[in-house]
Amino acid sequence: MESADILPGSRGTVDRRCEGSEEKITPPRPVEDFNPQLFPNEVYLNFTSMHGIQPVVARIRELSRKTVSAAMVPPLEWFERLPRLETPLDIEPLHLPFSVYLISGNAGSGKSTCIQTLNETMDCVITGATRVAAQNVYTKLSSAFATRHINTIFQEFGFRGNHVQAQLGKYQYSCSSSPPPIEELQKRDIVYYWEVLVDITRRLFESTASRGEFENIRALERLLGRAPGSLTRLAFCTNGSLPAFTRTNIVIIDEAGLLGRHLLTVVVYCWWMLNAAYKSPQYAEGKVPVIVCVGSPTQTDSLESRFEHKNLKCHVRSSENVLTHIITNRTIREYVSLSTNWAIFINNKRCQEYEFGELMKVLEYGLPITEEHMRLVDTFVVPEAYINNPANLPGWTRLYSSHKEVSAYMAKLHAHLKVSGERQFVVFTLPAYTFVKTAAFDEYKKITQQPSLSLDKWLAANASRVSNYSQSRDQDAGKTQCEYYSEHGVVVARTDVTYVLNSQVSVTTRMRKFVFGFSGTFETFDAVLKDDAFIKTQGETSVEYAYRFLSTLLFSGMINFYNFLKRPGLDEGRVREAYRRMAALTAKLIPGASVLESACDNPSGAPLNFRGLTDPPGFTGGTTNDWDDDNDVVFAALNEGAIDMLYCNYEFVRPETTQEVYSQFLMLKTMFVGRYSIFMDLFGGDFESSPFDTFVDNISYKGCEIFVGSMRGGVSSIALQTDSYTLMGYTSAPVYPFVEELARRKLHEGIAELFGAMNMPRMVLRDQHGFMSVLNVNLSEFVESVDDVELDMATAVDYGLSSKLAMTIARSQGLSLDKVAICFPRNNLRINSVYVAMSRTVSSRFLRMNLNPLRERHERDTVISEHILAALRDRDVQIVY
């Protein structure tokens, strides 16, 4: 490796990037002398991509040190006055200082790797624009190191569930000059987002909770005679509920192109307000927030929806996104010095085929489309009927432009499976429920002046709003049936939803699951044990629980080795040798099993005296009543080596202390690895690909339903939207952690009673590693906002699953898909949507589409493309290849 002191020079010098740095840059030294400024000792960097990323890290670190004078710091009193204003138009314009660093690039170019490096090199708040974006970042970060949960930017600045239905843009502010100064733009955004911001502000200052954590730390420093700021970090150790914005001034937002332009000011406003309210050290120092926006302005749209209650219609419109706003708005661009604070990542690393990569660049940057590009896309085109026929392209993911098209394809797929005689992919139906409170519904009709509004009509119009995810409209759902429970004041709407057994699915939100077994092969289970994958992904609450669970699976699954030896066609000599070696291994690890080893070495082949195993030392006689003759015959008929003496000599208990838990796991893991090595030596590949199933208790199947004796011994975990699952069926077995979680929910009394009596089944999933889990039901509460009145209208309960067999193009954003078939619309075709859909594939060999969008009439955002092309020619912009 080259000297750590040599920074990769890329359109700018090290001196310019680090100008104003508080740390001293030492002159070049020998290779073995480590430079702590460039490479801190506690950090492991990805050296293959560090060449271009290091200047990005240096520049963001430099921006984070920027401070403003005390006169420029927004005063606490300004925030406290806002909730008392009659209208947001009366807000006194105030400059809220901030910095921006923009990281853009085409799909799969390494933007997430850059976020990972920033996370490892500096203290920052990492967020996503959506839950999927946040969990994608979490997956990337946790693959290298243990990391805290990643929230959305909305969760970090205080957005709550009741804000979803807030009416944005109710007030409008027009700037008085052109181009407007920065404080005018900020007032415009605050006024636009007023309904949400005023509620967040009011809730903060009306809260009775103490906000004196940092004051207490400063008092402790004075008491101990310590230097000011020396104990500041203790505040986050002793007060876990402190807002993340008070910890650091670096805020990273992934997929920022999905956010409206006003969200930039909203984040800056909330950062200053929280730091002022908590009197944080960075507020006292006058530090300025650095908003690192990651994404692509040409890929994504910012969408805003507004529900019209009178006509029961939801209007969705595109709005200018944050990235486009930063790049194209003259005031913002000059204020943040965009040229020196912009990194563009080039080259698609997801699909590394040269011609296809060049095509993606053309679509991304608005370059001229040639006949050669069109001919390349022609090779992907097949008839639309071919894509929409479920019998074709099995296992491919269909992408559509609308939820209606997705739902229609799913219905067609299910109808095909019902008549195809397919045994692996079986169709089954389960009920989903919506509980509507009659009192709230009557109040809604009164406020909206719709006395004749029927519940069926309201449910049909609000189906996508009642659930907490838009993919609910993708499902193949039957007709809704309503039943009125007058004593409970609730109407229960039931809808039957169709699912496909053994199909690929994902969860629609962050949900609780209970892992109770493993279903895979000997090879996959051995891989899980060797790389500690389960400990890293499931042991988030307590490592002891994860080790205890694995010990249970190991103990229950050891019998699979003996079951393998009963397969017909195996060489008898190798089978006898396997029995002998396993007996020796068991005797070595469990001293009480030594009797087996001596029996296996008995050349006479005489039956093992099973009665003698239970006799005390020196016992020579006794009554025959102790042993049943039939049992004696059964045991004596078995070859002595065919019995796994692990189960005869080892009492499986649930240890309490950490040392005992790990000792038990280590012994059982050693036994599994030893047996695995024996069988690989004797049977090779035939063995490692054989089934290995193990559970905490006995299970049985009846059609698509799974029966489990007991869930005791399983472990609670979290299912993320970025995980890939196979739908294995459903179960009605009680899962006590789920029962306790439901009891903690503050549900309407009538709804809680009705739901508890339904015994709603739960889905059983297998993850990408092979672990089997029961998924809790997805329970979401719908609060309607009408004319400043909030109505707690309904509670929806479903299974929280979304099929990977078909989805909208918008939902596929950020995903890598193996095989993709796209149905583009023939009208309103947009190139950025085409780019998102085509760039999902990892290989163009597995890409099909119904038309060539380059030969069709389409819309293209040339304005933003021109700005990006200009940036590529700007020597101050950092280019990362």
From Swiss-Prot:
UniProt entry tagged with the keyword Transferase: no
E.C. code: 3.6.4.-
Highest taxon above the source species: Viruses
Species for this entry: Equine herpesvirus 1 (strain Ab4p)
Protein name: DNA replication helicase
Family according to the record: Belongs to the herpesviridae helicase family.
Keyword entries, A-Z: ATP-binding, DNA replication, Helicase, Host nucleus, Hydrolase, Nucleotide-binding
Region feature (Disordered): 1-32
One GO molecular-function entry: hydrolase activity
Function summary: Component of the helicase/primase complex. Unwinds the DNA at the replication forks and generates single-stranded DNA for both leading and lagging strand synthesis. The primase synthesizes short RNA primers on the lagging strand that the polymerase elongates using dNTPs. Possesses helicase-like motifs and therefore may act as the helicase subunit of the complex.
Residue ranges with Basic and acidic residues bias: 13-32
Subunit note: Associates with the primase and the primase-associated factor to form the helicase-primase complex.
Lineage: Viruses, Duplodnaviria, Heunggongvirae, Peploviricota, Herviviricetes
Compartment(s) where it occurs, according to its Swiss-Prot or TrEMBL record: Host nucleus
InterPro entries reported in the protein's UniProt record: DNA_helicase_dom, HSV_HELI, P-loop_NTPase
Keyword ATP-binding: yes
SUPFAM superfamilies, per database record: P-loop containing nucleoside triphosphate hydrolases
Binding site for ATP: G105, N106, A107, G108, S109, G110, K111, S112
GO (cellular component) term, any one: host cell nucleus
